Amino acid sequence: MKIAVIGGGSWGTTLADLAAKKGLDARLWVREQAVMNEIRSSRENSWYLPGRKLSDQLEVSTDPAAVAEGVSHFVFAVPCQFIRAAYQRFIKYLPKNAVVICASKGIELDTLMTMSQVCQDALASIKPRFAMLSGPSFAYEVIREMPTAVTLACKDKKAAKDVQEALSTPYFRIYTTTDVRGVELGGAIKNIVAIAAGVADGLGFGGDARAALITRGLHEMSRLGKAMGGDRQTFMGLSGMGDLVLTCTGDLSRNRQVGLRLAKGQKLLDILADMKMVAEGVKTAEAVHALGQKLGVEMPITEQVYAILYKDKDPSKAVYELMTRDLKDE
């Protein structure tokens, strides 16, 4: 299998390195000439993965045509608000019926489209076979070959099986499903809940509060997922509960770090300016808040996170309002 990974951040570089080490013909497209030069000369992406030697077999380029030549499988690993632009950049190099694997988690803010909807819209002329790769996975751990399990969602079962077999390793295990909508929504919404969990941790609350947020966040995820055609059972799996637990508890979680710093009184713009990588939950909170209102789905955690991020709401007041909502059955 020839595979091209689009995006030279930590996750894109990690997936490309994994594919190359597995023995696949793997190419990595990066935007910056300096990143390409560094990987070619020292086999390192020091900005995102300092100290990690990349496979000597991994090809890297800033030229879309060179990266895409002869390739049938494309992994897009760029921040979700830029995924449409990445599709548009590569559309003339993608073959008809190409397998397009999205490794970005979120909702497009301008359109409120999920990642699969953006793909089908932007790449309609080539009729891609879309797959969503999601689940509890920090690039920091995968690049170090620590055991990780993820989910690949694709309507085309053969395409899913091919990718599963091609990319699974003794340390990176891929499960498959046909529930694309459920998997992509789980990966998006968990980042919002992680911001809330970070806020709770930053305010000095304990494990009780974190457990409540994770559990009620899962309910929130399932409600919106069902309204949008996802299978509720999917949210009990790796791309739902698994990713939710990791992102709400892991010190490597960028979204949790945003919540922690907001609770300490830091301003959102200052936090984002100080981060090397994108915290997807910030824009996703705005998009999911709008989706919940549009579909009439109750999203209390999302509403409070949105208010903290965009209405300058005091985090302590947001927690108080969550805890004093009308009492109800579980």
From Swiss-Prot:
One function term, GO molecular function aspect: NAD binding
GO cellular component: cytosol
Record's subcellular location: Cytoplasm
PROSITE patterns: NAD_G3PDH (PS00957)
Gene3D superfamilies: N-(1-d-carboxylethyl)-l-norvaline Dehydrogenase, domain 2, NAD(P)-binding Rossmann-like Domain
Superkingdom to which the source organism belongs: Bacteria
Pathway note: Membrane lipid metabolism; glycerophospholipid metabolism
Any Pfam family matching the protein: NAD_Gly3P_dh_N
EC number: 1.1.1.94
Catalytic activity entry: sn-glycerol 3-phosphate + NAD(+) = dihydroxyacetone phosphate + NADH + H(+); sn-glycerol 3-phosphate + NADP(+) = dihydroxyacetone phosphate + NADPH + H(+)
Disulfide bonds listed in the record: none
Positions annotated to bind NADPH: S10, W11, R31, K105, A139, R254, V278, E280
General function of this protein: Catalyzes the reduction of the glycolytic intermediate dihydroxyacetone phosphate (DHAP) to sn-glycerol 3-phosphate (G3P), the key precursor for phospholipid synthesis.
UniProt protein name: Glycerol-3-phosphate dehydrogenase [NAD(P)+]
Major location category of this protein: cytoplasm
Alphabetical keyword list: Cytoplasm, Lipid biosynthesis, Lipid metabolism, NAD, NADP, Nucleotide-binding, Oxidoreductase, Phospholipid biosynthesis, Phospholipid metabolism
Sequence positions that bind sn-glycerol 3-phosphate: K105, G135, S137, K190, D243, S253, R254, N255
Catalytic site positions: K190
Family listed: Belongs to the NAD-dependent glycerol-3-phosphate dehydrogenase family.
GO BP, sorted A to Z: carbohydrate metabolic process; glycerol-3-phosphate biosynthetic process; glycerol-3-phosphate catabolic process; glycerophospholipid metabolic process; phospholipid biosynthetic process
